[in-house]
Amino acid sequence: MNVAICGYGAGNVRSVEIAFGRLGAELTTDVVGANLAVLPGVGSARAAMEGLRERGHDVALRERFDDGRPIFGICLGLQLGLDWTEEDGGVDGLGLVPGRSSRLLEGRVPRMGWAQVDDRGAFYFAHSYAAETPHATAWSEGVVAEARFGSFFGCQFHPEKSGALGAVYLEEALSLSRV
């Protein structure tokens, strides 16, 4: 099983690489040909989209999506998969999942720490913006925690920082790419 982590010059690439490596995944730079492409989180939406475009990852991810090949977005990666985010004055996303991302209006911002995701257990969150999409599949404290549409699936939390439960979640992501 090989995994391509779509770096964009920022983000949590190394921790995601380590987490998938612990599960036995082999890392590759071939975004189109990998069993699973991962869009990691952390950073600014505008800088992330610019970095994806500079590296050609936006085109490679669109090709994967159109071919029905799995893409997994983590935190900002989930938000970048949407049509648009209001972050940085408004930024077009990859347009893989209908929806948008908006600044959190309630509670402490940024939202950082452990929070329950439906009945699955607690995962680690670190974000100031959240997805708004009709394709949500899990929630945490009124915020979309997971969304799936076509071959794209993503989570707002950080499974790579969520201990044993996060490792189980990443294993599920790998298993979806085996189908």
Residue ranges and their predicted role:
Residues 66, 99-179:
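Amide-donor transfer/coupling interface in amidating biosynthetic enzymes
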